[in-house]
């Protein structure tokens, strides 16, 4: 018989090399063929074919316990064994030999930890049954020794396996050395060499008992089939004997049955008695249960009653109105000494009302009659207190103002300007600031009448203060009046033009410095005191006004901190689009309405004294207007805006009147020389520049634009009245405009633009006037020149001498008449230029322009003659230039 692969040492070494590093030792390795039990689709036939594999059993000791693993090895492309799969034998649950294989060499191993039990396990086919038995015996021995249990074995008799193991355990002869070094042969079974795994399936004692049993039947250990037949026959004989014995015991059975029937009757009687007792017990249990239910209900009712009493005590305590608070709310005094008690009563009332509302009170209590009655009582208390407090505050606001009116020293008087001081008034109002907050919480609608009463009273005071202050301010300001129209022809206006009227704008600035911060402070105080939900205000008067800030500091004011902002923190965080903003603006209109008339009176008074002071007042107003950013300063912004509009309107009226005076010059009789309104405009512009403050530059630039536009238009109209002298009038006036405004044009961009425009118009007028003078003295010369130039567009220069009137003879006649006595002609040209010129200072520059223009024209004529009449002699340009230079 061929040698088994289990004895192949090379195969074992190859397996050990494949698992090197795992600290496991190979117990057995054997070649097998792997296949599947169920054929798949025809396209996957290759997967069902048998594949060569090697099964290797390995063990690893972990202290007192061991781990056994079944490894599946496959051959790589190079013929080297490599691990394919690994099964832990502790999960081996079934060993089944396939009965469909006649050879009995195919088996499967079932493991209970496979993820998919629906997939058929692989089938392993051995070369012969000896290899199969050898592998299975080794697996079973390892399971019994290492795991302490055996898997289920199907398809093979385990006794046959044990007998085969006993017959096929080979004896291996080993040698050991004695003490004297000589080897001694020793017989050892293969099972002894396979440490711990080759134990027998049947113990020695069991085998001896089996031999004794077989010896009784005179059957050898190998005659198992005969022994099995013998046992079957004896079993049948025993069963027949049992049936016979049963038939012989019939009388005994009848006796037993009678006894059983008697016992049954007794049991029935006992069952009847037990049923009766059971009914009685059930009734007793029901009675006990009913009693327990009643007791539980009584106990629960007692607990509920106790809890209800506690809750009712709490509700009663919540509904109780303290007598001291009730007295304060219904009939208490509102004097300053009693305000703390009134505030405490308000706080208690607000808290009590909130406590009776559904979010703070259980909805079940909300419908109780006592709660409804108590809520009605609290509402009545609230209405009474709000009515009393409102009446008191209305009278109190009026009394504060009446007290001020009764003291005449409080207002400005003749010879004494009195700065309004509302510190004591605000201090007295602060006493009731917290009361106002609580009134808002109790009934917001009551604030409307209170606000109107406060506005009405304080409006009278503010208007009286502003009226008296403005009146005394105008009376105490001593300054002579400047003309309202600067561009008239009267001499008196120019004499008064240099009068210092700065006191006028200073008076207006003082009016704003005193009253604008006051109005802003009053607006801020009113917004906070009357509980408007608007953002916090900027510092009074806005930024960028040092005088204003100093004035506030002199008053000793602390910016009207009411000391009430900690009552309701929610009021400190309103949005920019607060719904109270519209109501605040309406109330501020009532508070400050009418005071603008006194500001208008100061503006009108200042305008009558010096219209140009409108520029300074406009800048001052704009500076104050840019500083008012707070929402509560809305009316102050409107007031400043109206003042700015009024000042702009009055200044525009002044500009219109001045422009009208300029236009009146158009209707005068023929005018020569520099028109009077040009130097007057220069003086006016110089004065206007001195008055510019802050943002009034745009206002002045607009006036400049209107002035100069009318000035230039009027100048052109006057010049057109006498076309003969139009250019002289234009050049003299445009030159005067440049001379007068040279310094201002260097610093004022708007005037610089008009300066350039005047310069361009001056150059054009000079060119026209000089050309007229030159043509007047040398008309034939330049007329001949013009004819030649006109013909050169149609014919060649060589043909021109043959044209009528342009022959060489005509040229000579023309030169003789024009250039003989040319010095006299030039002198006449100078006299004509000098004759009608009123501004002598312009003569040198005009004469230089005239000489240059004449030389340019004469040089062009000489070049033209040289081209058309090359043989003719004409006086040269150099000769003419020397002649002009000598004169």
UniProtKB/Swiss-Prot annotation:
Keyword S-adenosyl-L-methionine: no
Alphabetized SMART domains for the sequence: Sec3-PIP2_bind (SM01313)
Coiled coil: 221-250, 278-315
Any single biological process term in GO: exocytosis
Location of region: Disordered: 542-581
Compositionally skewed regions (Acidic residues) per UniProt: 555-569
Keywords: Coiled coil, Exocytosis, Transport
Gene Ontology CC terms, in alphabetical order: exocyst; nucleus
InterPro entries reported in the protein's UniProt record: Sec3-PIP2_bind, Sec3_C, Sec3_CC
Superkingdom of the source species: Eukaryota
Function statement: Component of the exocyst complex involved in the docking of exocytic vesicles with fusion sites on the plasma membrane during regulated or polarized secretion. Involved in polarized cell growth and organ morphogenesis. During cytokinesis, involved in cell plate initiation, cell plate maturation and formation of new primary cell wall.
Family: Belongs to the SEC3 family.
Protein name: Exocyst complex component SEC3B
Lineage: Eukaryota, Viridiplantae, Streptophyta, Embryophyta, Tracheophyta
